[in-house]
């Protein structure tokens, strides 16, 4: 409860500071609308089917990207973490690809995939892969050898050890990787919508608000909603980890 109260106090302090800056003569009124204006516009936008369509498009594409990233990264991490030969053979390629920012791949993705949702989903998958993959590998590195030896004593084969011993032990690490990947994928998703000419999504909403009549209140509405989605994802996955895989 104390942590929750402190969190509320931190949010309240941030909003008060924002309100003061927004109404201060130090900044032009149109450059930083105060939260009282932004949240009023947020209420208006939440009644707009068009805005809801943008939010749903981003959230749906984000969920698809996370599911695809999990489907690729977890099996790959299990293989790389349990088969040293494969890990050594792929290390150079992985270390080359991992530092490349997803946004740097936008031109290539547009040429290959066009301007549809496939582009933002693919780039979000690329960004989300790495935290899940490396957390899975790390989890297998930390696997207690005693658990493996005990399973083998009872006649469990290599695949059985992998799926019934290694994977359950790795789940807390994997879920932490998914939590990190979800917020990273959200950042990439909105960035691609903003930069790659998407026709729907929060990034597109922000771009339209900024490039049209310069409605900074709408720009900040899109930004706030993206932040709220990130907080809900992060807190939801953390609660799942604590409740179901806290071992």
Functional labels for PLM-detected ranges:
Residues 135, 139-174:
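Short cytoplasmic-facing helical segments at TM-TM junctions of multi-pass membrane proteins
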Residues 95-131, 138-139:
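Generic hydrophobic transmembrane alpha-helix motif, especially the helices
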Residues 202-241:
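Hydrophobic alpha-helical transmembrane segments of polytopic membrane proteins
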Residues 122, 126, 158-191:
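Transmembrane alpha-helices
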Residues 1-22:
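N-terminal signal-anchor/first transmembrane alpha helix
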Residues 241-247:
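Short cytosolic juxtamembrane segments of multi-pass membrane proteins
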Residues 64-94:
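Transmembrane-helix boundary motif in ABC transporter permease subunits
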